[in-house]
């Protein structure tokens, strides 16, 4: 993406002389808010729009220890209404699977120091270890490469090709950057091609949402709001993200409007949308909240 395009997105007030100021986002209506219980510390819900199904990464075990290499993690295949279709859909031995990204029949999921890729049709999987990573958190795929965040040590990694399922392929793993004061957690590919990152730093230090342009420059899209986790951009250009500090899922508009869509979470993690439905896992409560929106 060209720097000029990024400027128009990030600084609409400065660009007002040559472009119209974005409209204030009309609030969404939450038509229903349903809670589905019984999950084993769910960290991410991946929405497979092509096959109208969900995949939920879970830590398993008696405690939600995100760094334990205990082989207790798994991914469930779940219907849009929250009913579990297959509790352990993939047979691979995972530890603490976290962020999920889905494209076609490929599913990527992070797992402490590794990135898995699966074929959702055949269930075949392959794991690659990411040298130097401390806490592989979220993953997205853009232009044939996978990007993995590490919010513990403030790093972003690239793995290419992203589709390395075949054993004959040896993916190239690159440290894109480190120590940029982003502490990237949730990732998303924006409509303009930039890479969006939700900041999460512990102890309780607030961050916002950031955009990385094709040239690697990073800009702030929002002020410092909280400790952010899941992230997505809606078709209308507004952002959805979860915040551990406020225990909420939030919609952020082009003029800085903040709309709380749901609150009362103890561990709001990696969200996704399927049509007008928003899915938000609560890692601490072991639940998934399902919000039906008006649009």
Language model features with spans:
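A short beta-strand motif characteristic of beta-propeller blades
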Residues: 29-36, 83-90, 124-129, 171-178, ...
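A short loop-to-beta-strand structural motif that recurs across blades of beta-propeller domains
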Residues: 67-76, 114-116, 155-158, 208-210, ...
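Short loop/turn segments that connect beta-strands within beta-propeller blades
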Residues: 78-83, 119-123, 160-165, 212-217, ...
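Flexible "stalk/tail and boundary" regions
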Residues: 79, 212-215, 235-238, 251-259, ...
């Amino acid at each position: 993406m060209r720097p000029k395009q990024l400027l128009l997105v990030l600084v609409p007030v400065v660009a007002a002389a040559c472009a119209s100021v974005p409209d204030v986002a009309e609030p969404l209506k939450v038509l229903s808010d349903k809670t589905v219980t019984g999950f084993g510390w769910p960290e991410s819900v991946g929405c497979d729009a092509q096959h109208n199904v969900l995949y939920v990464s879970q830590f398993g075990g008696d405690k939600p220890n995100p760094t334990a290499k205990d082989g207790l993690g798994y991914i469930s295949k779940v219907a849009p209404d929250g009913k579990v279709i297959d509790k352990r859909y993939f047979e691979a031995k995972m530890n603490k699977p976290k962020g999920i990204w889905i494209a076609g029949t490929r599913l990527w999921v992070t797992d402490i120091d590794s990135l898995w890729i699966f074929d959702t049709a055949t269930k075949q999987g392959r794991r690659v270890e990411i040298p130097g990573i401390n806490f592989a958190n979220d993953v997205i795929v853009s232009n044939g490469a996978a990007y993995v965040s590490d919010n513990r040590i403030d790093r972003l990694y690239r793995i290419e090709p992203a589709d390395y399922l075949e054993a004959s392929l040896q993916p190239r793993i690159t440290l894109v950057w480190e120590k940029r004061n982003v502490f990237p957690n949730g990732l998303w590919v924006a409509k303009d091609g930039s890479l969006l990152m939700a900041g999460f730093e512990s102890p309780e230090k607030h961050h916002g949402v950031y955009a990385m342009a094709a040239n690697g420059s990073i800009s702030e899209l929002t002020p410092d709001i909280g400790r952010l986790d899941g992230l997505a951009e809606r078709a209308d250009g507004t952002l959805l993200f979860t915040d551990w500090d406020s225990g909420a899922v939030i919609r952020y508009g082009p003029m800085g409007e903040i709309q709380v869509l749901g609150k009362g979470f103890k561990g709001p993690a990696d969200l996704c949308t399927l049509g007008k439905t928003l899915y938000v896992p609560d890692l601490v409560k072991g639940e998934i909240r399902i919000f039906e929106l008006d649009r």
